[in-house]
């Protein structure tokens, strides 16, 4: 009776209450506004962090060349351009297909332009830059698995839309082909843009590497139509690794550990395994992928309540956009391993200087990514049990008070919920 009276009052006032799904979409729209007003730079790349008024301090060409603060660009605002643009592009393609406005189309195009730039600025075949500095082309020497993998995912998803012209479609296909061929020549090792700064290997025997190589080769054969990629894809999936296991078994097992620090890149893997699951026609392989989705989701579910421990900064004193404050410590680096060791020492300083970002990294990011992992699974009971907590987290988030860009995963989460609800 109360609900009927409430709706009648709303009608009299000319205001209709939002349905459950509309509430989530409305919150995703708020996040979208925040991301595009503050976090997407002039080079169409997402910054890791910015101030509440859009303050950002970009590395200069001299600083990138000198590996300052480190050759990975960790803790700078251009640390994760390939990673973030690729995964956000997935959500923006979904958003566009849900609401085909010129504005949403343009957002997809801009993210694609950013990913193309990351391939263009380097001089080493197979290199995908993490981001670009103050001149729009300078960049750090090291890339990683986590920059390359979302690059494939994002551009592969883009080609499924009706956005690209025939010329743009062909250009994108050629870029994906060129990247695949370059990595294959390197035996699937991820190159840096200088010698000794290689970081990552897709033929490794851990879960993430197995998902990366399986998905990249799937994207390659779907977008190019070339049989050689299809053949390689299935050889790798059914083949054995150095530890004697088949890759399909490794993927089915899911990640050995699910923790707050790993949920963000493992959510990307869950999205990729779902692609493999939905597109596979071999019943045996489909069972392996279903097992992977299930195992990963079950391990992630306990991370969703992390958001309750998140405490937004009450003022602006908990953040500085100036990453220079973490120097010292600094030391020259000869390779990627030295760069990573230096970066971990620097993080201790940076986390003290910007505790607001550290709070978001530790509590909010893993909760959003874990929720997406669960939503991507085929486990109806698990999703049903998690939904009350997921809804509270989504509806309680105020993106206007956040500094660290990974709250964009809320859009990925809501778009997936919307698609699965309409099935």
PLM regions: where:
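Low-complexity, Ser/Thr/Pro/Gly-enriched N-terminal "stalk/linker" regions
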Residues: 21-80, 109-110, 114-131, 167-171, ...
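Non-membrane alpha-helical segments in proteins
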Residues: 73, 77, 83-97, 110, ...
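Terminal, non-catalytic domain-edge segments
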Residues: 21-41, 164-165, 269-423
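Long, leucine/valine-rich, helix-dominated scaffolding and oligomerization segments
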Residues: 203-210, 222-292, 389-404
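Aromatic- and histidine-enriched alpha-helix N-cap/loop-to-helix transition segments
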Residues: 76-90, 142-153, 204-215, 261-272, ...
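Bacterial N-terminal signal peptides
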Residues: 5-15
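Carbohydrate-binding/catalytic loop surfaces
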Residues: 45-76, 124-144, 192-212, 250-275, ...
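Aromatic- and glycine-enriched pocket-lining scaffold segments that form the walls
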Residues: 143-218
């Amino acid at each position: 009776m109360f609900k009927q009276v409430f709706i009648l009052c709303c009608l009299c006032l000319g205001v209709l209450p939002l349905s459950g799904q509309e509430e989530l979409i409305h919150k995703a729209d708020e996040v979208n506004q925040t991301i595009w007003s503050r976090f997407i730079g002039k080079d169409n790349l997402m910054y890791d962090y910015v101030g509440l008024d859009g303050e950002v301090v970009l590395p200069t060409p001299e600083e990138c060349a000198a590996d300052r603060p480190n050759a990975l660009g960790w803790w700078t605002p251009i640390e994760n351009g390939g990673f973030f643009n690729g995964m956000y592009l997935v959500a923006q393609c979904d958003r566009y297909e849900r609401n085909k406005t010129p504005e949403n189309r343009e957002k997809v195009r801009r993210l694609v332009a950013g990913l193309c730039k990351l391939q263009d600025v380097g001089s080493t075949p197979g290199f995908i830059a993490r981001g670009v500095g103050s001149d729009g082309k300078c960049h750090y020497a090291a890339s990683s698995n986590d920059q390359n993998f979302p690059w494939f995912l994002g551009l592969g998803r883009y080609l499924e839309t009706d956005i690209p012209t025939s010329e743009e479609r062909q250009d994108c296909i050629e870029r994906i082909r060129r990247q695949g061929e370059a990595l294959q020549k390197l035996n699937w090792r991820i190159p840096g843009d200088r010698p000794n700064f290689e970081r990552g290997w897709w033929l490794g025997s851990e879960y993430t590497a197995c998902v990366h190589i399986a998905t990249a080769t799937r994207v390659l054969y779907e977008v190019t139509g070339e049989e050689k990629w299809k053949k390689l894809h299935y050889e790798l999936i059914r083949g054995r690794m150095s530890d004697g296991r088949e890759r399909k078994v490794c993927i089915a097992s899911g990640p050995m550990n699910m923790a707050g620090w790993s949920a963000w890149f493992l959510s990307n893997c869950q999205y990729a395994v779902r692609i493999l699951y939905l597109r596979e026609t071999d019943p045996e392989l489909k069972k392996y992928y279903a097992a992977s989705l299930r195992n990963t989701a079950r391990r992630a579910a306990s991370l969703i309540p992390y958001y309750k421990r998140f405490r937004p900064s009450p003022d602006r004193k908990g953040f500085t956009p100036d990453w220079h404050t973490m120097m010292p410590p600094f030391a020259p680096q000869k390779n990627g391993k030295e760069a990573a060791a230096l970066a971990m020492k620097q993080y201790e300083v940076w986390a003290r200087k910007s505790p607001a970002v550290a709070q978001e990294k530790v509590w909010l990011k893993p909760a959003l990514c874990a929720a997406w992992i669960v939503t991507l699974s085929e486990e109806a009971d698990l999703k049903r049990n998690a939904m009350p907590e997921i809804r509270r987290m989504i509806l309680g988030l105020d993106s206007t008070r956040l500094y660290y860009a990974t709250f964009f995963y809320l859009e990925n989460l809501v778009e997936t919920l919307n698609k699965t609800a309409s099935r």
